[in-house]
């Protein structure tokens, strides 16, 4: 055992030097990264990874739903992504009678595949560096406020101009996205094709796809079969189209080949996907601000809400299904905030940031260039001035906006205008519109008792963190009319407000009045929260007035410093297609503890706890384990489940394909480890890992567990 541990530690020491920080632009791969990737083990030409003039692996990687990544794994448009990426769709199709969240879902033929309105899959057709063109337009166009260089609206107009000038073909399904990179020092145009007829094909039960749930989230070792399957449909000509029974599976230009060989410690891997956001160019003051505002509020406010929700979800299956997606979404970044703050402290990231910024400032002094010092001083001043406003803004957003469904009550503005006009036709139209919106609202909140509990907890949590003199003005009413009792105020909202219950709403619609609207508790609460949002937004806007310009200078300095050292550069993540590469690698999270890079089905059985919903194991999976009926997916009598790689991932990489050195699919990225959550701000190769579902476990569940061998038949397995 001692020899094994020493061997692993030696491997860590020798292999960790290959950890490669960077969410690389595909357009820069050939010039910046080819040599390093080949040294690590890439066996295919870089043009097979990304080719601006032909098909490549890039063409099988899709943006799934706008927030995740997916990969096309068959010639007929079959898309593989994570279970948690498809979770909203699975919930959408679930009810107490057909509980696909609990039982899973498998379409045994094409007719059984379930249309999923609102879900899209997007292909990236072309990526163009348009920096020179954008800079030319910026010089020509009026810009009195100096904000065009980062304005999405302005850049959208420039994208249309460029497409017209270059005769780029635009169809109804084409989307142009022009984004600023490096704080506005470079610009890239992404030409996309969006498909909107997406159908659910398969998903394991949550006891597989969400095994470990909140306890294991952001942790390693993992034993989660976090995958789901969808299919892209198009019209008979292969063009994007809205749902129609006449649509057919898309015949794609490129799909991925799958390897059953698996990966071993030290093997080269690379990942493509759409990482959402990170902040590698922050100064130390900004990191500290993030810890004390955004992360602090996420941890404490979401934790309080989730406790209330979970208590009710465990009591009633209908409540569980309704709140499942909301709870999962909330819990995801609740735990992320906890892990990030702990990691930033443990790894002394603030000290590292201070050393980096001092290096750049010294470089500027040596060159007689004070622009970096001015930018640095400006950013520090801004952070100091906006701190209180940001803290309050985060409290409002977390506790009173995101957490409370009754913040989404319909607007009464149109009815108020009509009532003031005393025009009967206008009043009639406004009533009909409000009736429709009200019915939709009540359908979205079928469990008012749960909403009431959450509201009480959230208002108390908000009040706990915000001093009385700074709170939104609804607290003046709570203090004067309800003697400071938040419980009494919330009860009054649900018992007496127009939108408190359907009975009150129906009564109001029959006989609306300005008086009732003007003194309605829920309406007043919404106005008060909106006022708080506006005030904090104004304060933030005033404080941030010069931030973007200073940040652009600071980022340019960091770019130049890296390039002078011969180091490749990459921009912060912004939901655009990137590539990251590294190795399958175990790690040492603490003294005397070594985590292997692989997990197996044995670990699922070891974690089983039938009394804990997070660790329930399906009976059939236990039977397959007992009989070791793994088929061609097992190895040496074991069933691989997950593995880790030291690639540079973040949110948005969920569902990303993990490739081996030959460009074959070997896994699907789904999470990061707790020790590596600092990665959004500072990459630490010794501790940062991405957790991936082994493709062999995915296929084993589809084939052996679900009996959906027809899905296996359409894959290209090597």
Language-model-detected regions and their locations in the chain:
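Terminal presequence/propeptide segments associated with secretion/organelle targeting
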Residues: 2, 16-718
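Sec-dependent N-terminal signal peptides
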Residues: 4-13
């Amino acid at each position: 055992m001692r020899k094994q541990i020493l061997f692993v530690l030696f491997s860590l020491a020798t292999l960790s030097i290959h950890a490669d920080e960077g969410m690389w632009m595909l357009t820069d791969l050939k010039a910046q990264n080819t040599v390093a990737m080949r040294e690590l083990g890439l066996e295919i030409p870089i043009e097979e990874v990304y080719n601006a003039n032909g098909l490549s692996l890039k063409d099988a990687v899709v943006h799934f739903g706008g927030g995740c990544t997916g990969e096309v794994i068959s010639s007929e448009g079959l898309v593989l992504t994570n279970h948690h990426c498809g979770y909203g769709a699975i919930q959408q199709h679930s009810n107490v009678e057909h509980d696909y969240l609990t039982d899973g879902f498998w379409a045994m033929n094409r007719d059984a595949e379930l249309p999923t309105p609102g879900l899209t899959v997007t292909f990236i057709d072309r990526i163009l560096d348009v920096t020179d063109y954008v800079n030319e337009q910026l010089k020509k166009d009026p810009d009195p406020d100096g904000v065009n260089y980062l304005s999405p609206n302005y850049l959208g107009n420039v994208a249309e101009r460029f497409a017209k000038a270059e005769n780029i073909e635009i169809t109804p399904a084409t989307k142009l996205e022009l984004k600023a990179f490096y704080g506005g020092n470079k610009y890239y145009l992404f030409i996309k094709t969006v498909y909107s007829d997406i159908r659910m094909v398969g998903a394991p039960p949550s006891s597989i796809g969400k095994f470990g749930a909140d306890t294991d989230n952001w942790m390693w070792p993992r034993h989660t079969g976090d995958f789901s399957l969808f299919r892209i449909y198009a019209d008979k000509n292969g063009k994007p189209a809205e749902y129609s029974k006449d649509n057919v599976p898309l015949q794609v230009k490129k799909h991925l080949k799958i390897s059953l060989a698996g990966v071993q410690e030290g093997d080269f891997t690379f990942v493509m996907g759409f990482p959402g956001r990170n902040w590698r160019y922050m100064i130390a003051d900004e990191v500290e601000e993030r810890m004390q505002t955004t992360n602090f509020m996420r941890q404490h406010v979401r934790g309080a809400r989730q406790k209330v929700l979970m208590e009710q979800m465990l009591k009633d299956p209908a409540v569980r299904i309704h709140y499942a997606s909301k709870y999962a979404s909330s819990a995801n970044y609740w735990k992320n905030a906890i892990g990030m703050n702990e990691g930033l402290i443990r790894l002394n990231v603030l000290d590292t940031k201070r050393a980096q910024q001092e290096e750049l400032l010294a470089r500027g002094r040596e060159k007689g260039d004070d622009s970096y010092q001015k930018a640095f001083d400006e950013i520090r001043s801004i952070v100091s001035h906006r701190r209180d406003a940001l803290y309050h803004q985060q409290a409002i957003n977390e506790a009173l906006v995101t957490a409370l469904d009754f913040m989404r009550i319909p607007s009464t503005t149109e009815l108020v205008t009509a009532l003031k006009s005393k025009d009967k036709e206008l009043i009639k139209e406004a009533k009909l519109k409000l009736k429709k919106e009200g019915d939709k609202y009540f359908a979205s909140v079928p469990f008012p008792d749960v909403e009431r509990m959450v509201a009480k907890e959230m208002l108390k949590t908000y009040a706990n963190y915000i001093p009385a003199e700074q709170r939104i003005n609804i607290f003046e009413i709570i203090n004067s009319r309800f003697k400071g009792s938040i419980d009494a105020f919330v009860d009054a909202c649900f018992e007496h407000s127009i939108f408190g219950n359907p009975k009150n709403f129906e009564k109001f619609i029959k006989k609306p009045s300005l008086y009732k609207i003007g003194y309605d508790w829920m309406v007043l609460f919404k106005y008060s929260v909106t006022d708080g949002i506006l005030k904090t937004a104004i304060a933030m806007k005033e404080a941030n007035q010069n931030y973007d310009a200073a940040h652009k200078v600071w980022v340019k300095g960091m770019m130049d410093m890296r390039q002078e050292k011969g180091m490749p550069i990459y921009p912060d993540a912004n939901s655009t297609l990137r590539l990251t590469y590294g190795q399958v690698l175990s790690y040492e999270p603490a003294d005397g503890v070594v985590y292997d890079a692989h997990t197996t089905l044995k670990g699922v059985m070891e974690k089983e706890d039938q009394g804990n919903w997070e660790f329930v194991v399906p009976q059939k999976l236990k039977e397959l384990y007992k009989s070791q009926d793994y088929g061609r997916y097992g190895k040496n009598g074991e069933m691989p489940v997950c593995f880790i790689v030291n690639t540079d991932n973040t949110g948005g990489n969920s569902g990303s394909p993990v490739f081996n050195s030959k460009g074959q699919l070997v896994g699907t990225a789904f999470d990061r480890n707790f020790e590596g959550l600092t990665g959004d701000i500072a990459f630490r190769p010794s501790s940062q890992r991405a957790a991936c579902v082994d493709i062999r476990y995915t296929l084993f569940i589809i084939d052996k567990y679900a009996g959906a061998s027809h899905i296996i038949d359409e894959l290209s397995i090597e």
